[in-house]
């Protein structure tokens, strides 16, 4: 089954799927905070530079239409109905999406075990990169470093005081979130090399 899922859905789902598959999180309390550039919206007054520059604008903070896509795919993984709350924000970039996925742990798990779970899930997936730098400016996924590529970067942080696991995921909404995933699916369905035509390095710095 090859499904081409939209930008916010695929970006958040890739971070959440291993956690649900391993029954690590409370599936009744998943909150997705997504931030996306202007290319994620249609043409209109709200996407002009004058209106978009400098903004961090919430829109459709409840019942966004892409919520159903996330719930559909995660429910299939879990084998039961899962509910997700998602609140998107428009930000002052053209391309890129960052999902901060707030989850709550059902069992005690440490950072080492979480990395093992993510590596086990994505070790064969060349378009998924696991990101964590203990020092430096870019400790977590950042869509700036994904523009023009079909990669999705995933990382996480643990809030032990509140039993919270924050799974972070970033992608280029026009590539992994749209055309890149479509071409990748077409390659698989047609028997081509999965990476044909989409194995590009990110366009950073621009």
Regions found by a protein language model. Name each.
Residues 27-33, 38-167:
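C-terminal substrate-binding/catalytic lobe of Rossmann-fold NAD(P)-dependent oxidoreductases
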Residues 6-10, 38, 174-175:
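Gly/Ser/Thr-rich loops at beta-strand to alpha-helix junctions
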Residues 21-31, 190-199:
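Phosphate-handling active-site elements
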Residues 1-5:
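Short, small-residue-biased leader/transition segments that mark boundaries at the very start
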Residues 123, 144-206:
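C-terminal helical cap and adjacent loop that interface with cofactors, partners, or active-site loops
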Residues 7-24, 32:
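Alpha-helical support elements that line or immediately flank enzyme active sites
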């Amino acid at each position: 089954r090859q499904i081409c899922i939209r930008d916010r859905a695929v970006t958040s789902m890739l971070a959440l799927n291993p956690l649900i598959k391993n029954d690590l999180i409370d599936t009744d309390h998943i909150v997705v905070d997504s931030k996306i550039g202007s290319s994620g919206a249609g043409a209109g007054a709200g996407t002009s530079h004058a209106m978009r520059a400098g903004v961090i604008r919430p829109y459709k903070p409840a019942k966004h239409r892409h919520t159903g896509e996330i719930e559909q795919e995660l429910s299939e993984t879990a084998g039961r109905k899962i509910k997700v709350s998602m609140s998107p924000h428009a930000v002052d970039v053209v391309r890129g999406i960052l999902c901060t996925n707030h989850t709550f742990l059902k069992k005690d798990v440490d950072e080492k075990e979480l990395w093992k779970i993510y590596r086990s899930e994505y070790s064969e997936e060349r378009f998924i990169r696991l990101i964590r730098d203990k020092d430096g400016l870019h400790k977590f996924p950042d869509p700036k470093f994904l523009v023009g590529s079909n990669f999705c970067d995933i990382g996480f942080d643990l809030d032990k005081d509140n039993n919270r696991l924050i799974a972070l995921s970033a992608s280029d909404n026009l590539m992994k979130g749209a055309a890149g995933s479509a071409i990748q699916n077409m390659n698989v369905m047609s028997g081509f090399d999965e990476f044909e035509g989409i194995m590009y390095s990110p366009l950073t710095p621009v």
